[in-house]
Amino acid sequence: MASFKSFLLLALLAIVSEAAPPGHASHGEADSKCPLMVKVLDAVRGIPAANLLVNVFRQTESGKWEQITSGKTTELGEIHNLTTDEQFTEGVYKIEFATKAFWGKLGLSPFHEYVDVVFTANDAGHRHYTIAVLLTPYSFSSTAIVSEPHDDL
């Protein structure tokens, strides 16, 4: 069990690291205007989770969820520029990962229909958020890197 936890920790550290392939800007470089991005790793195959549908919602004052954007992860398991600084205001957000469809395309029958990550954003001033998710058909783990916006160099 301890080795599995160590694996999860190492996988999450790898997924949120600033390392990027040549020609690919990591968060904070060319994407300095990117207030919200996601990184997803397929822990079964040990590769980025490409072509995973992601929907982003903001909670309204009445408590309902309003979809604000959506996208699909790249071959690197990432989505940059999900929203803008102006649109990403203080509030409660939900990122919904369409995991059943993702695993179904691989011939697997997962437990979760969707995986949701719900969080409060910008309550202590404007920040940039990188949400990292590690997926298997029966479990998930998430972490966040919250940072100050970077000035253009």
Swiss-Prot record:
Domain of life, source organism: Eukaryota
Subcellular localization, as worded in the UniProt entry: Secreted
Chief site of localization: secreted
Record-linked Gene3D superfamilies: Transthyretin/hydroxyisourate hydrolase domain
GO molecular function: hormone activity; identical protein binding; thyroid hormone binding
CDD domains associated with the record: TLP_Transthyretin
Residues annotated as glycosylated: 81
Residue numbers carrying Sulfocysteine: 34
Binding-site residues, L-thyroxine: 39, 78, 141
GO biological process: purine nucleobase metabolic process; response to estrogen; thyroid hormone transport
Function: Thyroid hormone-binding protein, with a much higher binding affinity for triiodothyronine (T3) than for thyroxine (T4). Probably transports triiodothyronine from the bloodstream to the brain.
Domain notes: The N-terminus strongly influences thyroid hormone-binding properties.
Family to which this protein belongs: Belongs to the transthyretin family.
Protein name: Transthyretin
Gene: ttr
